[in-house]
């Protein structure tokens, strides 16, 4: 199996199987899917979106709040043999252009970034070719979009604009921290008040 070959795991945990099957069945049936997944840190949630991105073989965007998480995830994808790029603020202009082109072509299928960079790419018209061509959009640590968006990271409150622009087919929000306020905030912000499939 691909899980064994690329990630060195012999079996999927029940919740991993549930998430992965939900995404793959939606893809197979050519329908959109919305997922809100609450799993504790260290529970193997990355497999939930890494394996589908490997199987579907279409473009995936993963949004992270922290640079350290972005680098970690890029290494995981690369170790699994999945071509991934990371775009963040402060990059050399030539390197940024080179990496954007890798993602827009067939060279890299996964973009790991943050809301600020995506807003910059949209406003500067540099990611227009990806419009309507994004299979999966993953928002990891989704609780931060509510907690931080209300205080010092207003870019998180523009996630609906990013989603509207890029038109991803499958949207998944992951968090390890979710009370009723956070849950309703995520549903309102990311899923525009349409109740997602909650795991």
Regions found by a protein language model. Name each.
Residues 28-30, 53-55, 77-79, 101-106, ...:
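Conserved catalytic network of the ASCE P-loop NTPase/AAA+ motor domain
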Residues 1-38:
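Conserved pre-motif I regulatory segment
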Residues 26-37, 58-60, 108-109, 169-170:
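Pre-Walker A (Motif I) flank of P-loop NTPase domains
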Residues 46-47, 57-91, 95, 116-119, ...:
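Conserved Walker A/P-loop ATP-binding site and its immediately adjacent core
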Residues 94-111:
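Conserved motor-coupling elements within RecA-like helicase/translocase cores
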Residues 111, 115-170:
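SF2 helicase catalytic motif II
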Residues 29-51, 174, 178:
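Walker A/P-loop
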Residues 161-165, 170, 177-199:
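Interdomain hinge/linker at the junction between the two RecA-like core domains of SF2 helicases
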């Amino acid at each position: 199996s691909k899980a064994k070959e690329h990630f060195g795991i012999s079996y999927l945990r029940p919740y991993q199987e549930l998430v992965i099957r939900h995404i793959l069945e939606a893809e197979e049936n050519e329908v959109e899917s919305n997922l809100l997944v609450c799993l504790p840190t260290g529970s193997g949630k990355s497999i939930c979106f890494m394996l589908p991105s490997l199987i579907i073989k279409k473009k995936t965007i993963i949004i992270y709040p922290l640079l350290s998480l972005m680098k970690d995830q890029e290494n995981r994808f690369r170790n699994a043999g999945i071509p991934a790029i990371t775009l963040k603020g402060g990059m050399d202009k030539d390197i940024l252009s080179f990496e954007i082109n890798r993602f827009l072509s067939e060279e890299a299928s996964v973009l790991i970034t943050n809301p600020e960079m995506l807003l910059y790419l949209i406003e500067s018209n540099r990611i227009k070719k990806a419009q309507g061509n994004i299979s999966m959009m993953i928002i990891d640590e989704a609780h931060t979009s509510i907690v931080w968006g209300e205080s010092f990271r207003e870019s998180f409150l523009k996630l609906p604009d990013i989603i509207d622009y890029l038109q991803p087919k499958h949207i998944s929000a992951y968090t390890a921290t979710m009370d009723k306020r956070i849950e309703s905030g995520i549903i309102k912000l990311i899923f525009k008040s349409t109740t997602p499939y909650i795991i």
